[in-house]
Amino acid sequence: MGRFGLIGDPIVTSKSPLLFEAAYKEQEQPDGSPYKYDLIEGADFEASFKKFEEEYSAINVTAPFKELAYAKVEELAELGKGVITGPVARIGATNLLVKTSEGIAAHNSDFTGIVAAIAEAYYPGIVEEFIHEYAERFFIKLHQFFLMSLSRRFYQQPQAIIVGCGGAGRAAAVAAAEMGFGTVLMNRTLEKAQAIAQAMPEYEFFPDPIKDFKEAVKECDLIIYTLPVALPEIEEFSADDFAKKGACDEKVIMEANYKNPSFDEIARAKIAAAEGIYIPGDRWLLYQALTGYHFMTGLTPDLKAMEAALLG
């Protein structure tokens, strides 16, 4: 029987068990047991990782362990016991560890979840459509479609700002760039944004002081907000600040935190008044789960059941 779970601290209010069990409630494991998901809470990363090694087939990883988990798999890879390929190698943080025949593999479904959520914002219904048409290859096809459609939606390269450069922010930065957006990085310490830009010169990231946040929002097409707390400027925004630029598409605002959103009801009302699109943190959670659970189980999750679980 495979065992699955989540490490991080604090995680007691996580919705991940709800989503995982909804994703596979109509399916059984090879031994006939149901798919279950545990919260492996604790502030000690090494203890949590050891528990994974001893007892679990695959785990999700959340704050504050994403970069520590990546570093651990890097160490294992040097010994021939770890696997790092694809976007996670550029991001330098992982939210998903899976035991394989080649060792522990690190993945990043924050990256895939962001791409899926943004594509869904611009093309409502596309995720379900592509799952139906392409099954386990839906994400690759979705990403390809979005890149091909970009020039039809924007008359010049669209611009994104990533606010926060932790593990989720790094994934957001790579996702935005891989989707064709020129990408600005903002962090409370500019040096961290600069370090990420220097580490990934192929993306031509532009580090910008966080004091420029308000002006940058006016000028960009996509905002991905990953800080755990709200910047004071959010209260100061008017609806006009969220208005689209000229003939471009509506401005899209996405945030990571679903427990305590930084864009409160008032801010979201201003976004709506400007005909902008707000993607709440639970949609990010949904799509990172949708794209990540396949790595954990080898099975396609039930998207409709997951959506119903979130709404319930």
Predicted feature locations:
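NAD(P)-binding Rossmann-fold cofactor-contacting core
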Residues: F181-M200
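Rossmann-fold NAD(P) dinucleotide-binding segment
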Residues: L68, L76, A230-M254
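Phosphate/diphosphate ligand-binding glycine-rich loop within oxidoreductases
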Residues: G2-E129, E265-I266
